[in-house]
Swiss-Prot record:
Zn(2+) 2 binds at C142, C145, C168, C171. Zn(2+) 1 binds at C129, C132, C182, C185. This is Chaperone protein DnaJ 1. It comes from Thermus thermophilus (strain ATCC 27634 / DSM 579 / HB8). It is found in: Cytoplasm. Binds 2 Zn(2+) ions per monomer. GO terms for cellular component: cytoplasm.
């Protein structure tokens, strides 16, 4: 994964204002118009815009910081639009804007992450209103900007006349006003619609990972945005996840721990036999290599760690008590005398 902070030359703790300032400085320095024919500067410009597109969005930045964001893909026109918007305050080349990106959740079972799985996700996105064709109503050109969406202001400087283009405040950069509002969408031009999309969840995905589905965000005049699916892993009844490794807490009886036993532990592909050697103590760990989840880059699988927890019985039958007392006497361990606790309880009841 690229280091977007290094690309912009800022620290991981940088504020949004510091990130924006660094972006503007670098974007102006490496803009293709200032470096004609320089392929290296062109690639640098793309990287700078890609880094800013992620770090300027709080949600994407948080996911990136956790290592849960897939490498985004941007069209060249998107990067130039971002440059014009952030540096000059207007959209470059007057290209219609894409729809907004969306975020939804996809729930998976722990077993799904072993080989990957196809999942269907339901979510709601905005689509063009059929009643008005997505126009929001009957349009009329904005008289302030004459349908251009931008206004120009002029000022004299030492270098001559400086022209500044900004979004038209009257129509908010749209270039038109609504003479009549569509009742179906109330002038918004878009209406919500429930959608379904089937996605392939790759093996070994982390909890909270953002899975990008291009073109399934809100629809806008310039095309759709993207859909980001946040991975949610349902808790397993027996196994805990620790990265690519799994943990199973095995409760052993005193006799099993002392004498040894053959047990079965739950695995993602079925029960796994495990031989417990005599004299196993509380907290001992047995590592079953390859019993975990897939490692990044197809480098095998993690480990299933079996942690022993001794189950001390709270109640014993008279026969079991007798056997344990005989064992304690054999090994020289001092225990409470027979009937001690009953006599003590009776004392406090008086």
């Amino acid at each position: 994964m690229k280091d977007y902070y290094a690309i912009l030359g800022v620290s991981r703790e940088a504020s949004q204002e510091e990130i924006k300032k660094a972006y503007r400085r670098l974007a102006l320095k490496y803009h293709p118009d200032r470096n004609p024919g320089d392929k290296e500067a062109e690639e640098r410009f793309k990287e700078i815009n890609e880094a800013y597109a992620v770090l300027s969005d709080p949600k994407k930045r948080a996911a990136y910081d956790r290592g849960h964001l897939e490498a985004p893909e941007y069209r060249p026109e998107d990067l130039f639009d971002l440059f014009f918007q952030e540096v000059f305050g207007v959209r470059g080349h007057r290209r219609p804007p894409r729809g907004e990106d969306l975020e939804a959740e996809v729930e998976v079972e722990l077993q799904d992450l072993l080989h990957g799985a196809e999942k269907e996700v339901r979510y709601t996105r905005l689509v063009p209103c059929e009643a008005c064709g997505g126009e929001g109503g009957r349009r009329t050109p904005c008289p302030t900007c004459r349908g251009q969406g931008v206004v120009e202001s002029y000022r004299q400087s030492f270098f001559g006349t400086v022209v500044t283009r900004t979004a038209c405040p009257h129509c908010k950069g749209r270039g038109y006003l609504l003479a009549e509002t569509c009742p179906a969408c109330r002038g918004r031009g878009r209406v919500p619609r429930e959608e379904r999309v089937r996605v392939q969840v790759p093996p070994g995905m982390d909890e909270g990972h953002l899975l990008r589905v291009p073109g399934y965000g809100n629809l806008g005049p310039g095309g759709p945005g993207d859909l980001y699916l946040r991975i949610r892993v349902r808790p397993h009844p027996h196994l805990e996840r620790q990265g690519p490794d799994l943990v199973y807490r095995l409760r052993l009886g005193l006799a099993q721990a002392a004498l040894g036993a053959r047990v079965e532990v739950p695995g993602l592909e079925g029960p796994i036999p495990l031989d417990i050697p005599p004299g196993t103590g509380h907290g001992e760990v047995f590592a079953l290599e390859g019993g975990g989840l897939p490692l990044p880059g197809g480098r095998g699988r993690g480990t299933l760690r079996v942690v022993v927890e001794l189950a001390v019985p709270k109640k014993l039958s008279p026969k079991a008590q007798k056997l344990l007392r005989a064992y304690a006497e054999e090994v020289g361990e001092e225990v409470a005398p027979e009937g001690f606790w009953e006599r003590l309880k009776g004392f406090f009841r008086k």
